[in-house]
A protein has these predicted regions:
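Fe(II)/2-oxoglutarate oxygenase catalytic core
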Residues: 1-279
């Protein structure tokens, strides 16, 4: 399944991320690509995620049908929801994770967490308001399949520059074709400007087939989707993640900058804290 000759590039700045070209074996990848759900399949199925224009995840009827009828997708599902998948990427980011913990940016020693390889974050995406201190601490995987069409990236795909939710340890994007021609749709890596008040583009990554992008979602992991201006077909992708059952990143102080670019992790205002207690 995993191509032993894949090309792995590691980067530390502006935050740890990895690009893996030819990630899957050629024949296995091809089977996934030709069997990827059509837009019409997404339209006629229920959905519980709104990450892309059209998507599906564990528990949805389309996802169940895909696993029941397609051996390649069944094998992919079994791999993603396994300790093998989680350990593979923990090893790739091991030194980065240790550095984040040693510098108190990671509040939990996640490398010593237990692994729950069963679907945990089923359907909707868990946000910062939904966590409690009573949860057992463990790492778990997630996989969503989705398609982006013209306009994707304006109001979805994270809704502009952002960092993922506070439970996300490693986020991944795997491109699986779907289009003949595309303008936009790139994954953009952002960095803080010299005065730390603005963000500048650090790298723009094209949505190339069989390419996987993985990033450690620390508090500098600013990224977004360059909105699709024109496309013949659809930008098909898997969103993959390794997350914690509890928030693991240092809380971010409230400021105009963090409210705008790190809304998923910024500390709640006094009003919001009172509202949460009352609810």
């Amino acid at each position: 399944m995993i191509n032993k000759n894949c090309k792995i590039q590691k980067f530390k700045y502006p935050f740890p991320y990895i690009k893996i070209q030819d990630f899957l074996d050629k024949d296995f990848y091809k089977n996934l690509e030709i069997s990827f759900p059509k837009i019409s399949d997404f339209k006629t199925s229920d959905r519980s995620v709104s990450r892309m224009n059209y998507d599906t995840t564990y528990g949805d009827n389309l996802y169940k049908k895909l696993l029941a009828n397609n051996e390649s997708y069944r094998k992919l599902h079994e791999y993603i929801y396994s300790s093998t998948f989680i350990k593979y990427f923990l090893e790739l980011f091991k030194n980065n994770i240790q550095d984040e913990y040693n510098n108190n940016f990671l509040t939990e020693d996640v490398l010593n967490y237990q692994i729950n390889n069963q679907p945990f974050e089923v359907g909707h995406i868990i946000g910062k308001k939904e966590f409690t201190n009573k949860l057992e601490k463990f790492l778990y995987p997630r996989m969503d399949l989705g398609s982006g069409i013209k306009g994707y990236g304006k109001n979805n795909g994270g809704g502009g520059i952002h960092i993922d939710n506070p439970q996300r340890l490693i986020s991944m994007l795997f491109y699986i074709g779907g289009y003949e021609k595309i303008i936009g749709g790139d994954h953009r890596i952002w960095k803080k400007s010299n005065n730390n008040n603005f963000l500048d583009i650090h790298e723009t990554i094209k949505p190339e087939k069989n390419c996987l992008i993985a990033s450690l979602q620390n508090n500098l992991a600013f990224h977004d989707v360059n909105p699709i201006e024109y496309i013949e077909g659809s930008r098909n992708a898997f969103y993959l993640a390794i997350s914690s059952s509890v928030p693991v990143w240092k809380k971010v102080k409230r400021s105009k900058f963090s409210i705008k670019y790190n809304k998923n992790r910024v500390r709640n205002s006094l009003f919001q804290k009172i509202k949460n207690i009352l609810n």
